[in-house]
Amino acid sequence: MDHTLLYRPEWKQEWHILRTQATDYKTYYAFPALTRCENNVLVTVKSGQKHWGDEQSSLTQVTLNAPKQQVQDVRVIYEKAGFTPQMGEIVSMPNGDVCVYIDMQQCETNHRTGLWELRSHDGGKTYPVNRPVGVINGIEYGYAMDLIAKGNQVWMLVMTFPYQTGGRDREVHLITSRDSGETWEFCANLKELFGFSFNECALLECDEGFLIFTRGETDRHDRKSSADDFASGQHLVVLDENYRVLRSRDYRATTDFFTLTGRPRLYWIKGELCLFTRQWNEDSHNRMMSCDLFRIDPCTLEILSRVRLDEPRFPRQDGHYPVVYTQDGLLHVITYITCDRDQRETFEQKCDLVQLSYRLDEVLGYGKENA
């Protein structure tokens, strides 16, 4: 099988759920996350002015009726002067609550102020609980990057920062809750366990324990610019239930096509292990990016197929924190994409919240022709 072969879907639909044009290009919609609540899909998205360092911003929730493919509701669920809800990871808890874990930052900086929780008891209609997560085993965490529920237990990937309580450096830790997020406890320091630095990452359950995909980064003590991260590894790691590494693969080292990822997500879809991620090209100045799907063998960690879901659109565009759901034979990818109003601007160019849709059997069938 030619692992470098790139597939492009024949059928694709694009729906701009929230358009910055409707706000006279004042709003920068970015960083979606989602959870499924029966027929509804709850999507959180930052409504700000730029990628980071907003003067003011809010966290918006969009409620989609999945079977009808309609927007049911759009409303702000968090807004506070002086603070930026940079991203809100949303999860359906085992007890039925919907929780949002916000990467809270000071306005006009990317200085984290501690992980923040919103909690709903009515399927995301209201969020009466609004509170800091606080210190967990001596550490206050910032960025929440992924959550999974398995039975009555929940796990979350979170990052430490040296200026927060107990934070020695930028490290990704795995924490867990047995009471639907009311209390949390430490599981593992993944930076120490894996032996390398990384930032954005994805978490998924598997028969052996856990799958974690990591976006490598240069150690901040040695990092001169974001271009340095292009040399970093992009690993898929398998852990057992006791958080011991069983096997791993670095796709930067073992393929000639895998580049620096952005905000990866792992899913089981119809029994297939799927990685969705932004892929930068090697030209870090122009920052041409695509949104790609990789189908992976969970035993060998071999890439079975790669599908280009969205082509690069402009130099120095922003976008592609892909989150997905399926409905009636279609794969729906919710992401954010730079609008095409003014290509002369860079990262302050405004973005739309977008849904890209594909035929599920088509995108999962690529690479199986000669299998």
Question: Can you describe what each PLM-predicted range is?
Answer:
Residues 1-371:
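Asp-box/BNR beta-propeller blade signature and adjacent active/binding-site loops
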